[in-house]
């Protein structure tokens, strides 16, 4: 398949996508038999078995998009599409002109070979996308759902290297401890921390490190009390018993210098961000567990997992990505939502390296090549490739053009990608 055919076919896909979006979904007309054949031939060469727009016009291009993304991230990614021969040929494409003449040329008035390189055209999006400066964007994100709605602490808990997951801790906490063991866990509406022990723990000061997942939380209207249950299971090695004569137990958090009481009817509101919880145990106990029960929300100015709002204090900067980033936004959101962001990024890094390798003679990665930007920052990657002084300039230009077409195709297909 020639470069020209790829360019014309992707322009055809964009026209189809707009046409389907604008129609009511009950009918799908306007494509000639030649158009169907051209698309079928293209996907046959990519080993893509079926095209979604033929079988179900209500989900235009979704199946096709999923298969294309699967192809990009599969073991075939270093195959036919990445070879020099695929991009060297300018043979006459076999795409029918009927649909292109009807739906594309009157709007664009540009040669088909330039369509994908001009992403500001109306066939990509039916309406103009508003431009947001980084400051405005950050402020809008700060008002977004993660900050304004309650969240369950157990949904934030993440199992990391050297740390047992939240639910597996239930069985561990139900097992009598061999020695003193501090713990910090979460369940619905509650965060629990303390020390398990078979022997008495003397009264005094104890410090608990707030893990990263909890450091982004604040709590309002919280009761703080001693307990011995976790997800309905009894915690072994702690006691919740007390008498009226017991000395008070208090604690402090980094964001509040006041001593906050434990085991009272007081309703407390505080932030868990910033470091450690310092507990002053008023009376000796054979192990103890403190529960914080209240309404938890994400800290807008602390959550590294969502948005840091750092851009509010930065000057707006423009990134020259030829507007391709705008059209990849939907795709990137889908990847993040289904946990495939890192997988796809790794695949694109391998794809880019394989593409460059195929242009070298003998095939190899050029010395000094190292990408510091993510795959969707096309202009930065192009700058890195064009800076390879030990590679012929014409070869560098071909690599960038080849990568641009692949990125453009991802922008076309990615808008309809759904993980399931």
From Swiss-Prot:
Gene Ontology terms describing biological process: fusion of virus membrane with host plasma membrane; symbiont entry into host cell
S-S bridge residues: none
Assembly: Homotrimer. Homomultimer. Interacts with host peroxisomal glycolate oxidase (GOX). This interaction mediates its relocation to virus factories peripheral to host peroxisomes.
GO molecular function, one term: host cell surface receptor binding
GO cellular component entries: host cell cytoplasm; host cell cytoplasmic vesicle; viral envelope; viral outer capsid
Keywords on record: Capsid protein, Host cytoplasm, Host-virus interaction, Outer capsid protein, Virion
Highest taxon above the source species: Viruses
Homology family: Belongs to the phytoreovirus outer capsid protein P8 family.
Function statement: Capsid protein which self-assembles to form the outer icosahedral capsid with a T=13 symmetry, about 70 nm in diameter and consisting of 780 molecules capsid proteins.
Name recorded for this polypeptide: Outer capsid protein P8
């Amino acid at each position: 398949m020639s470069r020209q055919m790829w360019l014309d076919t992707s322009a055809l896909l964009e026209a189809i996508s707009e046409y389907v979006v604008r129609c009511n979904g009950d009918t799908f007309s306007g494509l000639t038999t030649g158009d169907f054949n051209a698309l079928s031939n293209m996907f046959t060469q990519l080993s893509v078995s079926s095209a979604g727009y033929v079988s179900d016009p209500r989900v235009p291009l979704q199946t096709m998009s999923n298969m294309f993304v699967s192809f990009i991230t599969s073991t075939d990614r270093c195959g036919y599409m990445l070879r020099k021969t695929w991009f060297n040929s300018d043979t006459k494409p076999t795409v029918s002109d009927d649909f292109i003449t009807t739906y594309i040329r009157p709007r664009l008035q540009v040669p088909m070979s330039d369509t994908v390189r001009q992403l500001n055209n109306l066939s990509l999006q039916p309406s103009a996308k508003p431009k947001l400066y980084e400051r405005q964007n950050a402020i809008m994100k700060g008002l977004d759902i993660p900050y304004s709605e309650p969240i369950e602490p157990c949904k934030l808990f993440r199992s990391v290297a050297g740390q047992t997951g939240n639910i597996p801790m239930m069985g561990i906490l139900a097992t009598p401890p061999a020695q003193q063991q501090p713990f910090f866990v979460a369940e619905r509406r509650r965060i629990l921390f303390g020390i398990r022990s078979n022997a008495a723990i003397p009264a005094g000061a104890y410090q608990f490190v707030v893990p990263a997942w909890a450091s982004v939380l604040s709590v309002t209207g919280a009761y703080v009390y001693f307990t011995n249950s976790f997800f309905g299971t009894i915690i072994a090695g702690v006691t919740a018993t007390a008498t009226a004569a017991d000395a008070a137990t208090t604690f402090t958090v980094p964001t509040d210098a006041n001593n906050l009481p434990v085991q009272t009817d007081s309703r407390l509101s505080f932030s868990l961000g910033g470091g450690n919880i310092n507990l002053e145990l008023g009376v000796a106990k054979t192990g103890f567990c403190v529960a914080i029960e209240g309404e938890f929300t994400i800290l807008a100015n602390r959550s590294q997992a969502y948005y840091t709002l750092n851009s509010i204090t930065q000057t707006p900067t423009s990134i020259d990505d030829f507007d391709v980033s705008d059209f990849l936004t939907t795709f990137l959101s889908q990847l993040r939502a289904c946990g495939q962001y890192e997988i796809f990024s790794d695949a694109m890094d391998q794809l880019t390296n394989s593409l460059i390798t195929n242009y070298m003679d003998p095939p190899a990665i050029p010395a000094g090549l190292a990408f510091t930007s993510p795959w969707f920052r096309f202009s930065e990657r192009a700058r890195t490739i064009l800076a390879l002084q030990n590679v012929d300039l014409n070869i560098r230009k071909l690599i960038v053009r080849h990568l641009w077409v692949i990125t453009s195709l991802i922008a076309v297909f990615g808008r309809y990608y759904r993980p399931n």
